[in-house]
Every structure is written in structure tokens, then in C-alpha cells.
Design a protein with these regions (language model features):
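Internal intein/HINT superfamily modules and their associated LAGLIDADG
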Residues: 1-143
Length: 143
């Protein structure tokens, strides 16, 4: 399995040399979901807007900048969605950051794409449940 993953650019211990390569296009959303399951998060926070508390949605992937730019390009190509990259860590060997999809529309478009055609054997249950919670909250607040 280790050998199989290295042919796609997946290597242990982040060091700034990570890259994404040779992933068949038809599996790209599944690959990105798996990457996000390992190094991503889904946030639902409530912010006060005058008289009401409104939900704010955010989905993130953390990695080295090189991989984040590749993922950003892949997502732009597949669903015409561009997330924002924030650099938060620089070392001698690499810089790391987060690719963020913030807001109800952007976060949902990204999450719908990565969870489309997935099943419970292909995803982390607790992250998928957060996605389902997103759907419920969106239905309630953004009709």
C-alpha cells in the first residue's frame, strides 16, 4: 500500500516535497476528500448579526503551499470554485498553510463535490456528519 501511495505523490512526514501526481480525473473528488479527511476540517460557527445569530460555514485543507496550490487548481478545474490560501507556517524546508472555502455557498459547493458518489466505507463518519449538519442548518437559515 505504501508503494502504491508514493506513486501518486503521497509520502510520509510532511517535508515540503509533497506533490499530487498521476491521479485519474474520475477519482479526483475522492482523492481530495481523502486528503481533507486526513488534513482538513469543517467548521460551523455562529456570528451575531445585529439581532440574530447566523451560521458561518468554513471548510479547510492544511498542507504545504505547493500541494495547496495544486488542490486549488484541481477544484477550480472541476467545479469552478476558488478557495483562498493562507500561509501560516514557514520553516527552512517548506511553508505550510490552509486552503479555505468560507461562506455558505463556497463551502457547500466544495463539500457537495467531495461527498458526491461517496459511501460510508470511503469517508470519515464524523466529518460526513458535519456535512449533513451543514445541510440541515442551510435548509433552516438559507431558504
Amino acid at each position: 500500500m505504501f508503494k502504491d501511495l508514493t506513486q501518486y505523490g503521497i509520502i510520509p512526514r510532511k517535508n515540503g516535497r509533497e506533490t499530487i501526481k498521476n491521479i485519474p480525473e474520475k477519482y479526483m473528488s475522492h482523492f481530495i476528500r481523502g486528503y481533507a479527511d486526513g488534513d482538513g476540517c469543517i467548521h460551523i460557527v455562529y456570528l451575531k448579526n445585529y439581532l440574530h445569530w447566523l451560521p458561518e460555514f468554513k471548510a479547510e485543507i492544511a498542507s504545504c503551499t505547493k500541494v495547496l496550490k495544486q488542490i486549488q487548481k484541481i477544484i477550480k478545474k472541476h467545479i469552478d470554485l476558488e478557495g483562498k490560501i493562507y500561509i501560516h507556517k514557514q520553516t527552512k524546508s517548506h511553508e505550510g498553510g490552509k486552503l479555505i472555502f468560507a461562506g455558505a455557498i463556497r463551502a457547500m459547493k466544495y463539500l457537495e463535490w467531495i461527498y458526491k458518489d461517496s459511501n460510508e466505507s470511503m469517508r470519515l463518519d464524523y466529518k460526513y456528519k458535519k456535512y449533513l449538519k451543514y445541510l440541515q442548518i442551510r435548509e433552516k437559515h438559507f431558504k
